[in-house]
């Protein structure tokens, strides 16, 4: 085993005779001498090789990524040749002997950080991709994050408990990954979407403080920050308030940032309600690294005969709202403006329009529409010459979501986002339920085990759409990185929740009977949170896709190009499971 990684060699090793083992990152052969950049996981070390060294001739045919063992003396570099960009840049290894431990074929793509390689080939040769400095750094960062989490929770008297991967398929979630049972005819296990009920049962078992860094599985459509299998930091506590959980998680995240980024976060995380988040930012996971808040023009627009305004106001909960982009009047071409309009209209709003500010006046297609309210508009948006105002009309929720999406797009296009910022935010006071028009019933905003603002199940049936939950989400830079709540801990309340979700008694007793019975054996009040580890590390690593912080991820279609998974299986395996394939 190495006593010191070669990337960590420095002046303190000068004069020592060492054997350095690593991969050839680069080789420059000048005929009678050669320079090799030898790499291990901690960095690079320059090796100087004279032609008098045995096996020097073998270097002519050596490919990058071959593995060498080089024995020699560590010497200080001449000041003129010091490399300040690597940790070992003040020294080099003068080779005395070279052993080729393993040769490499020609690479399918260059591993230099700046070299462009397609996603498919990177996934197929992931073991090569992970040799790149950036990818190694991402995995080391992930390790630092998980270590900081474990250290913090262990210090807070949490118990790390594993829960099973072969569980029961239940409704009220994304699609399950199913595992057919060979022993139990025509029956299936499901891979867990989360250990939700199991961690609650651990509270019923009296453990009081539980955590687990656990793999979860959801058969859902993929995007940049999602994978079919992902890792979450799962925790649960008994006898706690919402504030207790938030304080614990906030302290943990501050410890994570300090351990992984060296940044001391001293301010308390801001807290806003779900309603405030939607009203101000058009999103339940707002990015607060930039301003551009939504403004409501509904009252200002009432009585205005403009067809643009009236078309939106006639909608149910019709509103007129807008955002102001600073210095954006000349920032976009006609084609870009058409793209922005399509982005907004895809949310199902009634109308979209823009105006620019010139010489203190609103100009453009809405100039006459707001001619009597020019001063009010400028004050409301704090608009100045050169700014552009985007107006959207339609039903409240769709307008808010459209402007929320537009707000983020504009911030990226106008380069308003400070990528060095880490803006955490708590979103609280969520509605307990939301109406699903496709299913024609209520569904839980979080999950069906979330406690309402009061517990008596009989009260929930009066005005379910107005019922608030005791839930909270933690947001970082516009990403929801975690969510949790206080949980229902009485059977009557849990049954009432299932019924509000349109479940029949025989159905919820079949699917959740074991859990309902557990609630009758002295179940403590409890709450917790699940934190998306992949997404958190992605943000801390300043990556745009969680695949960059997972060692062996699936691609955008949910396949593993390296393992060639999923794949067909033998007929014999299917027969043992009593399964037959259909086209």
Curated annotation (Swiss-Prot):
Locations listed in the record: Cytoplasm
Residues spanning the signal sequence: none
Keyword Protein biosynthesis applies: yes
Region (Aspartate): 196-199
PROSITE patterns: AA_TRNA_LIGASE_II
Residues that hold L-aspartate according to the record: 172, 218, 446, 487
InterPro entries: Aa-tRNA-synt_II, aa-tRNA-synth_II, aa-tRNA-synth_II/BPL/LPL, Asp-tRNA-ligase_1, Asp-tRNA-ligase_1_N, Asp/Asn-tRNA-synth_IIb, AspRS_core, GAD-like_sf
Keywords: Aminoacyl-tRNA synthetase, ATP-binding, Cytoplasm, Ligase, Nucleotide-binding, Protein biosynthesis
Pfam families listed in its UniProt record: GAD, tRNA-synt_2, tRNA_anti-codon
Site feature (Important for tRNA non-discrimination) residues: 30
GO molecular function ontology, one term from the record: ATP binding
GO cellular component: cytoplasm
Catalytic activity, reaction form: tRNA(Asx) + L-aspartate + ATP = L-aspartyl-tRNA(Asx) + AMP + diphosphate
Enzyme Commission (EC) number: 6.1.1.23
UniProt: ATP binding residues: 218-220, 227, 480, 532-535
GO biological process: aspartyl-tRNA aminoacylation
Similarity field: Belongs to the class-II aminoacyl-tRNA synthetase family. Type 1 subfamily.
Function: Aspartyl-tRNA synthetase with relaxed tRNA specificity since it is able to aspartylate not only its cognate tRNA(Asp) but also tRNA(Asn). Reaction proceeds in two steps: L-aspartate is first activated by ATP to form Asp-AMP and then transferred to the acceptor end of tRNA(Asp/Asn).
Assembly mode: Homodimer.
Protein name: Aspartate--tRNA(Asp/Asn) ligase
Organism of derivation: Streptococcus mutans serotype c (strain ATCC 700610 / UA159)
